[in-house]
């Protein structure tokens, strides 16, 4: 039985929780993996309803600078949904480098516009204190200081670095959580060169998050456009 299930999965286009079936060039049916138990299938279904609600909200903004593929329906009793395909290809650094300067500018403008619109879908929350240490991989830094620095640095330099680490651990600042996509990476953003269409997909993780997290998300870091996205975000937000 297990072998048969494994062979079945090999024939599916699937991710960690879902598999998809294409209906022509424009539509996708999505269902939970057959390996999921009842609780996991129900959790999957709840996530799809959360996704659809977020998609419907951001589509209602109707911003022409970007595209949000429509989730057409969810059938709870059959654990399946139907949604539109996003045109184009995943927005990787390799693709971005081949685009014209105009297209690159439009992408930067589209990302910033999307971020502003997402942040404004729901009320921004109150200021919260946030430690810089929470953003850094302190375990790796600790390991380097304690176990590897002695190979290249003397005792005084190691002591100085340890003091810097300890000081950073106490730094904190105030910031506001805002409604965000929370999973912006090249796998969830597509671009169609022929139509200059920028599409955002996969809103399963949408939630309140610190504003800068989506501004400096993996997508912008990998494309090396985080600075112009930030500047454009500020300009649009302040208009």
Where is each model-derived feature located?
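Short pocket-lining segment of the protein kinase catalytic domain that shapes the ATP-binding cleft
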Residues: 81-89
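A conserved alpha-helical element in kinase catalytic cores
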Residues: 28-81, 98-111, 222
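An alpha-helical support segment within catalytic cores of ATP-dependent transferases
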Residues: 2-4, 120-182, 192
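ATP-binding glycine-rich phosphate-binding loop
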Residues: 3-24
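Active-site Asp-x-Gly
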Residues: 178-179, 192-238
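Protein kinase-like catalytic domain
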Residues: 56, 115, 119-123, 219, ...
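Conserved kinase catalytic-core helix
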Residues: 89-130
